[in-house]
């Protein structure tokens, strides 16, 4: 199904150049194996959307939005993971999103061209799977990709400005993941509603 494909790809990119990442101190802990907090954070938004869809909350008018949010949430997470891991492994230059100063790989709130492009490709791939499976149509697939990139940029801003700062010790990666992925789902749904309103 949909989530297993995401897990396989995520696991593969996490292990890319793992020795190099470990030497630089930017590798995921436990060889990339996710703990309970990470699993919950990564799947919470998707699970909520799935439950809302299963129980037909809001009726038929909302059914399409819940499915769209489901797909967008996983597109956002996969894009986030792929961009981060590819950036750590192959990013030539890493920039802080707030100042565009060059910073070391793995810095919170930093991005690279290689990682960003890989994240867009990953999100597009997963949106394409959603389209093939009939979960989203083509315009909705595009919205999933757009929403994932906006949400991931927001996550980078949070990482650069708040994470690891005094008073925000509670804002760990798991919490940021929940915010990021939920934002991707909500943004896709909002953009869909705006698109429908504009067409009508």
State what each model feature region is:
Residues 1-200:
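Hydrophobic alpha-helical transmembrane segments
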């Amino acid at each position: 199904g949909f989530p297993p494909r995401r897990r396989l790809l995520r696991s593969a990119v996490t292990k890319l150049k793992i020795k190099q990442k470990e030497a630089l101190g930017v590798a995921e802990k436990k060889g990339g194996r996710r703990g309970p907090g990470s699993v919950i954070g990564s799947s919470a938004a998707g699970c909520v959307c799935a439950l809302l869809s299963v129980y037909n909350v809001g009726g038929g008018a909302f059914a399409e939005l819940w499915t769209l949010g489901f797909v967008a949430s996983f597109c956002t997470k996969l894009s986030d993971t792929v961009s981060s891991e590819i950036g750590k492994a192959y990013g030539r230059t890493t920039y802080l999103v707030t100042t565009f100063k060059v910073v070391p790989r793995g810095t919170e709130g930093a991005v690279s061209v290689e990682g960003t492009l890989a994240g867009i490709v990953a999100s597009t791939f997963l949106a394409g799977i959603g389209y093939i499976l009939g979960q989203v149509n083509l315009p909705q697939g595009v919205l999933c990709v757009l929403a994932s990139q906006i949400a991931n940029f927001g996550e980078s801003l949070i990482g650069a400005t708040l994470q690891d700062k005094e008073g925000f010790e509670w804002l760990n990666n798991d919490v940021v993941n929940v915010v990021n992925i939920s934002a991707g789902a909500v943004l896709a749904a909002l953009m869909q509603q705006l698109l429908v309103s504009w067409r009508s």
